Amino acid sequence: MSKRDYYEVLGVGRDASEREIKKAYKRLAMKYHPDRNPGDKEAEASFKEVKEAYEILTDTDKKAAYDQFGHAGVDPNRGGGGFGGGGDFGDIFGDVFGDIFGGGRRGGQRQAARGSDLRYNLELSLEEAVRGLTKELKVPTLVGCDSCDGSGAKKGSSATTCGTCHGMGQVQMRQGFFAVQQTCPTCHGRGKIIKDPCSKCHGNGRVEKTKTLSVKIPAGVDTGDRIRLAGEGEAGEFGAPPGDLYVQVTVREHPIFVRDGNNLYCEVPISFAKAALGGEIEVPTLDGKVSLKIPAETQTGRMFRLRGKGVKSVRSHAVGDLLCKVVMETPVNLSERQKELLREFEASLTGESKKHSPKAEGFFDGVKKFFQDLNN
């Protein structure tokens, strides 16, 4: 199962305060704690997930790294910290609750953790998103160490079970009537001791590497779409399965078109004369220019639909439309002769406004009636 977003795990928004995060954590930790759900593996997994999310989102540096890079930004082996808990019921529970449930040692030996999922933010132009393409991505990640085959131990040696926690990665400390589960101080939660570590990975079993992946982006993707590449996340601990890579798509704003689902919108300026007399204009599409017939007496703001000139759906393969809104442009920088012609034209309409400008006439009739009603 893929590692979920930490904010989603705690049920809070990305702008949640630390107080809101702690409140959500306490509620969920009480709900899923294994002592309240004995033998329930799903509850146990949920508890670990909640604990991990809380550790990251209440640490300022880790939270900033996670917000920017996702799970890849908080890996313990990436040079400056990151999430370092092993994945069992670490000391965070003891810090917040003091193990109010008590209870004995649970489970068998700790299993190596699956690799973390990675997120890659990919920005595309509208043209790239509409047509689809193959992108080459360079992804910094952790891969299994080829020197020790991911074991962390020098060739010819092997890891041994930790004698302190007997392979569980956790130890139980009693404080009066209460028992507190804490990360084993000897193996640091791994459950195993590597006495002769690999010189290349220093006993981690994984090393940093930038992978180059060729990713096919399907035609029709849009902002918010996510492409999953199974097994292309970080290598798991000591031979455990790798995580997945999620390519998060963002489409840049376009200077001409606005996308809404599978439809495209654009505004096309037309002259006063073209709007009044009609004619043909050229409008842009993603496939080039096309001719659009404008009928006489077209009003500004009228929408024209060009069917099949939109975006092909990435799911249904249906093709949307291009909707062109014509906007009448008022002429500027007129010569005296041009202004004179417009005055003559305006004068020729005097007394015939109902015929030539019915909307304006109706509007002013309504205004006149409004003020008459006020005075009565």
From Swiss-Prot:
Compartment(s) where it occurs, according to its Swiss-Prot or TrEMBL record: Cytoplasm
A Pfam family that the UniProt record links to this protein: DnaJ
Region forming the signal peptide: none
Keyword Zinc (UniProt): yes
Cofactor: Zn(2+)
Binding site for Zn(2+) 2: 162, 165, 184, 187
CDD domains xref list: DnaJ, DnaJ_C, DnaJ_zf
Binding site for Zn(2+) 1: 145, 148, 198, 201
Matches recorded under SMART domains: DnaJ
Keywords from the named record: Chaperone, Cytoplasm, DNA replication, Metal-binding, Repeat, Stress response, Zinc, Zinc-finger
GO cellular component, one term: cytoplasm
The CXXCXGXG motif repeat ranges on this chain: 145-152, 162-169, 184-191, 198-205
PROSITE patterns: DNAJ_1, DNAJ_2, ZF_CR
HAMAP family reported for this sequence: DnaJ (MF_01152)
Protein function: Participates actively in the response to hyperosmotic and heat shock by preventing the aggregation of stress-denatured proteins and by disaggregating proteins, also in an autonomous, DnaK-independent fashion. Unfolded proteins bind initially to DnaJ; upon interaction with the DnaJ-bound protein, DnaK hydrolyzes its bound ATP, resulting in the formation of a stable complex. GrpE releases ADP from DnaK; ATP binding to DnaK triggers the release of the substrate protein, thus completing the reaction cycle.
Domain commentary: The J domain is necessary and sufficient to stimulate DnaK ATPase activity. Zinc center 1 plays an important role in the autonomous, DnaK-independent chaperone activity of DnaJ. Zinc center 2 is essential for interaction with DnaK and for DnaJ activity.
Name of the molecule in the record: Chaperone protein DnaJ
Organism this protein belongs to: Shewanella amazonensis (strain ATCC BAA-1098 / SB2B)
